[in-house]
């Protein structure tokens, strides 16, 4: 029961984090948009780099990219909280039911990991050379979230068996 509760609480912690991320992106829209704007504009990368042709100067496309991130985060948040409810309902049920209840949280955490990996580490850091920026480099935060969510996903993936602590 303790192991199941730990899995549930860790999932709830990530769901809370995502709720706050969405809240911040919506209520402090411009500050967070500026991050996306500058990464896509590539205006703080190394002078003279040969990747500047990748930059997206269109504010409309930058806004669309930012909205897609927020939409991804909202979808992930909904799945995370849905997963919390599913695990909570299955907390005292047989191990097979608890294991089955993990499907939604596994999808949610995978969606989360894909966002941090694809949107920030692959597209932002590598394609738009975010790693070159002293001001708009979100690699450390993205990797931190990727690692935390991944660790919790690995914990959740451990099968539950009858009689486990």
Where are the predicted features?
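Juxtamembrane transmembrane-helix termini
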Residues: 24-37, 83-96, 125-132
